[in-house]
Amino acid sequence: MSTRIVVTGTDTGIGKTVFSAALAGALDGFYWKPIQAGLDDETDTQTVLRLSGLAAERVLPEAYRLRTPASPHLAAELDGVTIEHQALLVPEKDRPLVVEGAGGLLVPLTRTITYLDLMARWRIPVVLCARTALGTINHSLLSVEALRARGVAMLGIAFIGEENVESERIITEMGKVRRLGRLPHVAPLTRDTLREAFADGFAIDDFLKGPA
């Protein structure tokens, strides 16, 4: 079985879709977002297809496409859809697969199940994406604690934003977690500029050698 990686974040809107696009492209692999909530604007899957450089068949269709940009449990209820979380099984592919979650770890999929519950069941190593802005220390360390409490293995933490040496250092030291690198805000954001920024900030082998 090839490498499978779950990308999650400390919050919503922190850049994990752009990071996932860069990672999937660098791995020349596959991408899958199981649940998309919100269809009016460009979806995360469409963003990854635009930025990753992957062929269309490498960007897998979502299991659930929900109209409302909200927590999956609410978006599903508004659409009259039941999320059958037991059927959300991570595909096995012949190349690396990047699986992107929605929001943070404790985002509800249903009234009884969170994304963290799903990750604990999958038993696939996680990359935690974290901001570098004010507030990231608390959010990041809480997320690391939550993952560890559920026995979810971490490949490490990927910072997103402008350099913040002290915050990045204290998170990795206190959290005892590997710093994978940092992806700055990229402007203009294109396939080429993203690929270059990711190559400058990360070593792809770190994503292939297993949890620290």
Swiss-Prot record:
Tagged with keyword Lipid biosynthesis: no
Compartments, record wording: Cytoplasm
GO CC entries: cytosol
Cofactor: Mg(2+)
Catalysis performed (reactions): (7R,8S)-7,8-diammoniononanoate + CO2 + ATP = (4R,5S)-dethiobiotin + ADP + phosphate + 3 H(+)
GO molecular function, one term: dethiobiotin synthase activity
Active-site residues, Swiss-Prot/TrEMBL: 33
EC number: 6.3.3.3
Pfam families documented for this protein: AAA_26
Transmembrane regions: none
Binding positions for ATP per the UniProt entry: 13-18, 100-103, 184-186
Pathway recorded for this protein: Cofactor biosynthesis; biotin biosynthesis; biotin from 7,8-diaminononanoate: step 1/2
Annotated positions binding Mg(2+): 17, 100
Disulfide bonding pattern of the chain: none
GO BP field: biotin biosynthetic process
Entry keyword set: ATP-binding, Biotin biosynthesis, Cytoplasm, Ligase, Magnesium, Metal-binding, Nucleotide-binding
Keyword Membrane in annotation: no
InterPro entries named among the record's database cross-references: DTB_synth_BioD, P-loop_NTPase
Domain of life where this protein originates: Bacteria
Chief subcellular location: cytoplasm
Subunit structure: Homodimer.
Protein family per UniProt: Belongs to the dethiobiotin synthetase family.
Function: Catalyzes a mechanistically unusual reaction, the ATP-dependent insertion of CO2 between the N7 and N8 nitrogen atoms of 7,8-diaminopelargonic acid (DAPA, also called 7,8-diammoniononanoate) to form a ureido ring.
Protein name (record): ATP-dependent dethiobiotin synthetase BioD
Organism in which the protein naturally occurs: Nitrobacter hamburgensis (strain DSM 10229 / NCIMB 13809 / X14)
Organism taxonomic ancestry: Bacteria, Pseudomonadati, Pseudomonadota, Alphaproteobacteria, Hyphomicrobiales
Gene this chain is encoded by: bioD
